[in-house]
Amino acid sequence: MGLFLLLFLLLPPCVQAEDVVYLTTEQFKARVFDYTKEREWKYKGDKPCVIDFYTTWCGPCKRLAPIMEELSQTYCDQVLFYKVDTERERELAYAFQIQSIPQVLYVPVEGKPILLKGLYPKESIVQIIEEQLIKRPTPALPTEGGSK
């Protein structure tokens, strides 16, 4: 029992957290936004989220998946990560006009979401999460000069 407790305490906090969660259309409407009842965007969550619209046969989607898994662990206590299979959830894909994949929806707790098409490098995704979802300012570069 003591060894189990020690291992549990030594594990990073996000090992026990959910990874990327697969959403159905109904789950999306319950957790994110019910586009059938609301006209204006109003996010239902209390943490920002990232939603990957994908299909199982899409090459770029397959390359994006491990990046999203990794980032779901990195930001597990700050950002929720979801996936929506556009082949299975056609109504939802249609509602968001998803015609090419992958597309990723970045949803802040307050304000409008950002929908980006295509595969972006991990560094760009991190920058969007940091600046648009977590709202951490980008560190300022030191300026040259000073008193003479």
What positions do the PLM features span?
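Sec/Tat signal peptide C-region and signal peptidase I cleavage site
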Residues: 13-17
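A short beta-strand-turn-helix
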Residues: 23-47
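Thiol-based oxidoreductase modules, predominantly thioredoxin-like and allied folds used
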Residues: 53, 64-72, 76-91
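Bacterial N-terminal signal peptides
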Residues: 2-12
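Solvent-exposed loop/turn segments at secondary-structure junctions
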Residues: 55-59, 86-91, 112, 122
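Short, thiol/selenol-centered motifs that function as redox-active sites or metal-ligating centers
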Residues: 55-64, 147
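Short pre-active-site segment immediately N-terminal to redox-active cysteine/selenocysteine motifs
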Residues: 46-49, 53-57, 100
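Non-catalytic, surface beta->alpha helical segment in thiol-disulfide oxidoreductase systems
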Residues: 100, 105-148
